[in-house]
């Protein structure tokens, strides 16, 4: 008998509810084709939660997420709530507390150049023609953003500011394991990013990654300095499979990876804890300027569902079916307006219908 799964669905603001509706269509197709028992509960988060409950992350939403196997998150924020105190705004008051509450230490950001979308890549045509499919694995809770001491002191010519890069062995070990396990589901290559020629934290990082790699003899490991990595991503992104990064370096490289794909509407994201409980969301924002127009690209939200199936539900076959359905739609020239470039475009609803149908049919 198949296991019962429960997903907390948090559509949020802006285009969030529209693109989430398409992901739920695809979830229905997955249920039917793979005989998976998946139930969902919907909760307010972000600006809509402020309007309805007076807080961007209501207690009922947190409690609902605690009862779920994973969180499928839309997007939060918009001009309506920009003048609130920073800690009460949708982004800071909802997403960051959720990450902290569930101890989500790893961030996974796929960046893929899909066949037929090479013209959107800002790289040279001969580089884009090779394509790329990269997974950036970023450590989220350690490093220079959180290390102590940090602050400012002194005055005049002696005023100074300081931050501290701190990593513990256990933090590096667990994010490295995520990267190697992910590589086993892909092309079996990890490139670990550091600055071990200068930084003590990077020397420790490299030593521990080498130790973890011994448990994964089937996965190729390479090390690369961060400055070289930023250049190699421009020169030949096809050389990379999984990038393993500290918090700071991952922040930089994941955005660079996103930019060279040419479309934020195609980029999902996953944040996981040690139990592989995860929060899955599009990498883009709430896009309030196009909300309600039925023109938003839902693919990033649908791919976030695929990540959820793969990492939190261990349903790799279902995740692959979604990815293949999206590939098929794009290869057939199906485009939302952000990808159409003057050609005929389908609506948000139509793109969701097509992908759900292709999942149900199989490719």
From Swiss-Prot:
Cofactor dependency: Mg(2+); Mn(2+)
Pathway noted in the entry: Amino-acid biosynthesis; L-leucine biosynthesis; L-leucine from 3-methyl-2-oxobutanoate: step 3/4
Entry annotated with the keyword Oxidoreductase: yes
The name this protein goes by in its record: 3-isopropylmalate dehydrogenase
Broad enzyme group: oxidoreductase
UniProt KW keywords: Amino-acid biosynthesis, Branched-chain amino acid biosynthesis, Cytoplasm, Leucine biosynthesis, Magnesium, Manganese, Metal-binding, NAD, Oxidoreductase
Assembly and oligomerization: Homodimer.
Reactions it catalyzes: (2R,3S)-3-isopropylmalate + NAD(+) = 4-methyl-2-oxopentanoate + CO2 + NADH
Lineage: superkingdom: Bacteria
Amino acids binding substrate: 99, 109, 138, 227
GO molecular function, one term: magnesium ion binding
Described function: Catalyzes the oxidation of 3-carboxy-2-hydroxy-4-methylpentanoate (3-isopropylmalate) to 3-carboxy-4-methyl-2-oxopentanoate. The product decarboxylates to 4-methyl-2 oxopentanoate.
Record-listed E.C. numbers: 1.1.1.85
Chain positions recorded as NAD(+) binding sites: 78-91, 285-297
Single Gene Ontology BP annotation: L-leucine biosynthetic process
A GO CC annotation given for this chain: cytosol
Upper classification of the organism: Bacteria, Pseudomonadati, Pseudomonadota, Gammaproteobacteria, Enterobacterales
Residues the entry annotates as binding Mg(2+): 227, 251, 255
A Pfam family recorded for this sequence: Iso_dh
Site location (Important for catalysis): 145, 195
Family: Belongs to the isocitrate and isopropylmalate dehydrogenases family. LeuB type 1 subfamily.
Cofactor-binding details, from the entry: Binds 1 Mg(2+) or Mn(2+) ion per subunit.
Subcellular localization: Cytoplasm
